[in-house]
Amino acid sequence: APAGLWHEQPPRKFPPSLDARILAKISQHFMKTAYRIPVLKAIGYKKITHLWRELSFESCRDSVIAMARSKGYMPMWHGANGRRFESVVPERVKLSVVFGDEDLTLPEEIAQEKSVAPAHSRWIVVDNCAHVIMWNYPELTVELIKKTALMAS
């Protein structure tokens, strides 16, 4: 979530993505095997989505490659940690804030403070959805993007 939506700041000094990047750098060399072994797939995805068993090989492969190549979130983490939104988002900028009701990475109780989102934003909670909506509902993701874009025209 944008740092401005956190109720509480995370207790960690380093972002959780650091663990994911290390795991991805190792597992990229045996992705097909890791995907087929439930315990290994669970290590990579169970903390992100309750629907981890349903993830396609393509989604897992793409996420492993992206995390393995990632430079990380440290610059953003250092810049945003402990901050709130500091400027007004003009109403002409249409935006939607989308969370899954099963988001284990950014749960509602610590990371979804609706009161600090721009007043004109659409707050959308997707049922039976985890942190990465495009993994669980790719068609709905496209639909939400199109709806938000149409609001701007």
Residue spans for each PLM region:
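Conserved serine/cysteine hydrolase catalytic core
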Residues: 69-116, 125
